[in-house]
Amino acid sequence: LGLSEDQVVEKTLIPEDESAYDAAVDLADQGCNIIFGTSFGHESYLLQAAAEYPEVQFCHATGYQAASSGLSNMHNYFDSIYEARYVSGVVAGMKLNGMIADGTITEDTAKIGYVGAFPYAEVISGFTSFYLGAKSQCPSATMEVQYTNSWADMSGEAEVAAKLIDDGCVLISQHADTTGAPSTCEDKKVPCVGYNVDMTTVAPDAALTSPTNNWGVYYTHAVQCVLDGTAIETDWCQGFAEGAVDITPINEAVAAEGTDAKVTEVENAIKDGSLHVFDTSAFTVNGSSLEDLI
């Protein structure tokens, strides 16, 4: 975009409290034309700031109140991370099949543990899509979910992962932001799927892959809109087809044979629209399809 470093002001580790409002106001007072809030709990504070600074664009990740706020300078954005979670579930399901084939587990003991942050829609849709991906490869797979009630709690995530393993889970995944769960899996020799980043640095013998976000797609788009003087969408969401989500490289030392080829096949199907993670085509209401009802 041709911006210089002094045109970008960054604030990190902003809590989900009044500090978020203070940070947003400070950025606006510094002359920022567009401000991004990147944690779910920042939204109400960004809404407050947006009402006070109508000439500044405020963009909030993972939120939902922009459309109902009536503020033309308030925007919500997220990517279709559920698509990447589905693909990472395929990786996990293939690993379970490999463990069944080599006698490490049986079909009846193919149980996944999921370390969730909060019982929010974002987390629920994420583990649902992950489970659908796993089930597409290993139909006998079951899954148990436990929450830490925090986005980032290293010890809490490690503790929940250990509890899930003690409860019979033979593979762990997560929607939480630290390396706590993968570290536990490495110690206990249990395969895992991480989140956000490649976990092989902390779990080289356990990590399979991680679904990951490419926020740069949105940041580039939104900032370009400001530069061009064009409107930013109130709600924005893109996925694999636009490069907004992906999975980290498959750890060949842990993954099942043939995983790379299957992942390519599934990703291409999502991109061309032949595979829908949440396929409602077979849903009916009183015998009528949703399409007919609409």
Regions found by a protein language model. Give the residues of each.
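A residue-level marker of the well-folded mature domains of exported/periplasmic proteins
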Residues: 1-294
